[in-house]
C-alpha cells in the first residue's frame, strides 16, 4: 500500500485506488449509456464525468436549481451531482456549439471543474 501526504501536510493517508473506465455510447441499456449505468448496482461507487454546458455548470456551483436539470446525451446524469454523495460531475464543453478556442477563460472553467472533481475523489 502506498501513502500520500495528508491535508494538514504532516500526516499520511493511504492512497485511494481510482480506476478510470472510458465508455462510448453504442445504444440504450448497456455500458456507455450513463442513464442506464448510473442505476446499476455495479456502478454504485462510480463517479460519472459528463460533458456539461458552461451555463448549467455555473448554475450548479452557484446552487441554482437549473444546475441539476437533466440534459441530453451523457448530461442526462446531471441531477446526480446533487445530494450528500454526488454520483456525477460535469466538465464544461461550452454552450451551444461548444468552445471554439482554448482561451484563458475556457482554461479557467475547465480547471475549476477538474478541481471540483479532485475534491470529490
Regions found by a protein language model. Name each.
Residues 1-121:
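Macrodomain-like recognition of ADP-ribose-binding/processing modules
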Amino acid at each position: 500500500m502506498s501513502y500520500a501526504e495528508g491535508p494538514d501536510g504532516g500526516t499520511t493517508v493511504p492512497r485511494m485506488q481510482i480506476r478510470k473506465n472510458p465508455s462510448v455510447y453504442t445504444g440504450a441499456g448497456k455500458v456507455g449509456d450513463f442513464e442506464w449505468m448510473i442505476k446499476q448496482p455495479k456502478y454504485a461507487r462510480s463517479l460519472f464525468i459528463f460533458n456539461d454546458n458552461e451555463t448549467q455548470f455555473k448554475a450548479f456551483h452557484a446552487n441554482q436549481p437549473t444546475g441539476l436539470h437533466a440534459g441530453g446525451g451523457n448530461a442526462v446524469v446531471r441531477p446526480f451531482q446533487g445530494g450528500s454523495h454526488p454520483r456525477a460531475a460535469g466538465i464544461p464543453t461550452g454552450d451551444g456549439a461548444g468552445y471554439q478556442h482554448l482561451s484563458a477563460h475556457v482554461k479557467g472553467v475547465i480547471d475549476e471543474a477538474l478541481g471540483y472533481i479532485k475534491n470529490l475523489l
